[in-house]
Amino acid sequence: MRPKVAFFDFTSCEGCQLTVVDSLQAHLDLLDAVEIVQFREAISERGEDYAVAFVEGSITRESDEARLKQIRERAAVLVALGACAHLGGVNAIKNLAPLDDVRKYVYGVKAEWYATYATRP
């Protein structure tokens, strides 16, 4: 039985997921080794039963953290995919300045509309 695999995205450019898609196209035999049940960049299905979860992107909101915890509860194995998931990536640059200043710079007068906190891998 092939392990069920899911891919999830958080705050990122999603380039790492696109690299996975490119790799799968170049090595189609990998698709015989796993069953992909969720992967927004590649399929429209949304399976909730998976053994391995690949997570791309950094965590920048409370809702991200809650979603990540749900993913972790379902997966036997959780893999951080890419620099954003592992180290915070480019998104972590905002951690170098006061968060209120960053929010005002990025969102302007609508800064209060967006719930965000310091970027975490």
Model-identified regions with their sequence ranges:
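Iron-sulfur-associated redox domains of electron-transfer enzymes in respiratory
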Residues: 1-121
